[in-house]
């Protein structure tokens, strides 16, 4: 069996694994929140092969841009590259599998500091026109933003799902239930990803049972709809938050 087919099979198998329980889905999202610039497909495969990864890049980028050498014996993380006419494999390496050489540097990985939270809250309230009731805490604001983004893009992310449910647990559910559960799962997943990446505890507003319907998405054919929604929506928000954090970062003392 080819390596390409092995990785395709791994994606299918791991989709079943991460949708096995609320805790499995949250464990996947812990990894995905750190790698929010990657697609759902990539996040899923990175979680399957290197769940503790924090910053991944190709060998060429590490060597030529960051002047970091990949450690001898390090195993690349295989991802599916579907940008060309034929699917092929591409490999990335986590920063933990590299070391700096002369002139080397580390990628900027923003971290929200406690003194920045009020500024981020104000920024989100302005950009997303949040109501006052949604700005009591940063967690409230993140949940409101997640809810708004999912609501605004729901039709796009549901498009085609009805044709993919055959052979999954969604097959026995009616359209209204699928739509309602998808909206809630997507909202809670986006919020979880945002909260985790911002260094907050998502379980202050959520309970494990909020993800109970993830088990209905028991094949990659349907999980991809939810995963793509959560990944793409959280990415745009987190890029904005990251830029805002950088704006309000205090200069290092000289």
Put a short name on every predicted segment.
Residues 252-254:
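Positively charged, low-complexity/disordered segments
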């Amino acid at each position: 069996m080819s390596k390409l087919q092995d990785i395709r099979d791994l994606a299918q198998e791991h989709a079943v694994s991460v949708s096995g329980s609320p805790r499995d889905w949250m464990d996947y999202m812990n990894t995905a929140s750190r790698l929010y610039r990657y697609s759902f497909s990539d996040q899923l495969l990175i979680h399957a092969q290197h769940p503790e990864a924090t910053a991944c890049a190709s060998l060429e980028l590490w060597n030529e841009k960051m002047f970091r050498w990949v450690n001898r014996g390090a195993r690349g993380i295989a991802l599916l590259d579907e940008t060309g006419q034929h699917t092929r494999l591409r490999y990335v390496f986590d920063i933990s599998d590299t070391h700096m050489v002369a002139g080397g540097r580390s990628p900027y990985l923003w971290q929200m500091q406690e003194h920045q939270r009020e500024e981020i809250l104000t920024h989100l309230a302005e950009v997303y026109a949040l109501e006052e009731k949604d700005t009591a805490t940063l967690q409230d604001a993140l949940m409101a933003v997640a809810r708004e983004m999912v609501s605004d893009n729901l039709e796009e992310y549901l498009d085609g799902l009805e044709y993919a449910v055959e052979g999954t647990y969604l097959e026995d559910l009616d359209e209204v239930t699928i739509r309602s559960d998808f909206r809630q799962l997507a909202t809670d997943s986006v919020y979880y990803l945002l909260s985790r990446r911002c260094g907050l505890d998502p379980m202050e507003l959520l309970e494990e049972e909020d993800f109970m319907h993830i088990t209905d998405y028991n094949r990659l054919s349907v999980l991809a709809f939810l995963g793509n929604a959560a990944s793409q929506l959280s990415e745009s928000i987190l890029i904005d938050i990251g830029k805002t954090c950088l704006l309000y970062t205090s200069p290092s003392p000289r």
